[in-house]
Amino acid sequence: MTRIYLVRHAEAEGNLYRIAHGHYNGLITARGYKQIAALQQRFEHIHIDAVYSSDLFRTRTTARAVYLPKGLPLHTDPNLREVNMGVWEGHTWQQLRMEDEERIVDFNRHLDRWQVPGGETAQQVLDRFIPALTKIALENDGKTVAVFSHGAALRMVLGTLEGRPLSELGSTPHGDNTAISLVEYDEDGFTVLYRDDNHHLIDANLSTFAKQRWWKDERMLESDMYYLPMTDAQRKELGIGPEGEAIAVLHGGELAGGVQLLPQKEPGVGWIGWYGLLPTWRGLNRGIGPLGQAVQYYREKGAQHIRLHCQDAETESFFRHYGFEKTPRGDMDLYIGYGEKA
């Protein structure tokens, strides 16, 4: 018999910024690194013989919670990846709801009929993932292993291992970031002992789900900001000059704020010239989503850092909370490259 801990990756950019990231190689967030520390404590007294993960940054980084303290190598396998979301990749969930609501509902509730151009079906995910998991189990007979993967893929796999048909997978729960499930494999196949346990996050007040509402909705739909190129009139309303590019932050057709991007200011650095929400939209836990637009924009251009000036201590505290650090010049800097973070 093989015991397998299935672990979802820590909070990553797609989770924080509410962007569809399947095969997109997003980074771990500041809260995500705290979740990894809590996960390491959770596994401190659990014997593990081998550690596996998908080959994406967010799972490999999360797996450090187990393989580094235990002195084990990390085995990566692309068959453990998240579902490929095709043309959805890189779009916010709110944008997808506005443009493709029926398929969003299918993704959340009717996985047997969900498919988007260029993406995988749920069955295709199962056809690569379960054989890979079976191979891991067979190679580690009599041992205990940890396997790090992704939310949607694990939801599909765990539901299937519980004996549910494809048509019922949409009624199964989502697991929080770093949620742990335990399965056993023997001659009769897989048995799910428990799934989606996140008590190490609840105890530390680090749950991503506790700060989000979408999963509480019956159809699991977003009601959030969306983003469009900013018009000259909107620039004027926000007091943003003509330099660079600007993204309007909107909600229900109403201007809520914006982001000004200055890609020509410094080579290799993505500068933000203006970032904010209008007063009526502040204090509603809406302020961080627009940063995801800047991160994706600048990463595509090859930048490894995002920088901005903060005018007051409150704003500086906000950006520190989300991983920015102060430079010797007094600017706030966020690293968006793929080097390992200590």
Which residues fall in each region the model found?
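Conserved beta-strand in the GNAT
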Residues: 248-263, 269-276
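Active-site-adjacent alpha-helix immediately C-terminal to a catalytic or transition-state-stabilizing loop
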Residues: 60, 130-189
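Conserved acetyl-CoA-binding loop-helix of GNAT-fold acetyltransferases
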Residues: 34, 277, 283-296, 321
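Active-site-proximal alpha-helix that buttresses catalytic centers in soluble enzyme cores
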Residues: 7-72, 76
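Conserved GNAT acetyl-CoA-binding A-motif
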Residues: 298-311
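Conserved catalytic-core motifs of GNAT/GCN5-like acyltransferases
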Residues: 307-309, 320, 325-338
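Phosphate-handling substructures
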Residues: 70-127, 194-196, 206
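Acidic, low-complexity terminal tails and accessory targeting/binding regions
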Residues: 87-94, 160-233, 328-330, 337-342
